[in-house]
Amino acid sequence: MIYSIYEIQQRIAPVAKQYGVKAVFLFGSYARGEAREDSDIDLLVDTSGTNLRSLLSLGALYCDLEAALQKPIDLITV
């Protein structure tokens, strides 16, 4: 399935809120409108001001985002 940007936003918003994430930015093929069925979803997440510093907490965020999207993701945090 290929999601619209709106669908991605709706799926990740509850997860971002749960973790206190300041902002999530979409980049890559989905942001360019070039996504294919096999495309992953590339996300940059602003975790400043949160307690998301340990590998365990970042792994939980990754898993929850991937579960919400039901597609593989690439996650970059700042």
Task: Write out the residue ranges for each language-model feature.
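Metal-dependent nucleotidyltransferase catalytic core
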Residues: I8, T47-V78
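Short connector loops at helix/strand junctions that flank enzyme active sites
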Residues: Y19, D38-D40, A68-Q70
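A generic local structural motif
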Residues: Q10-I12, S29-A31, L61-Y62
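Conserved beta-strand core positions
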Residues: V24, I41-L43, I73
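Catalytic metal-binding acidic patch
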Residues: G28, G33-L52
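Helical scaffold of the NTase/Pol beta-like nucleotidyltransferase catalytic core
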Residues: M1-V24
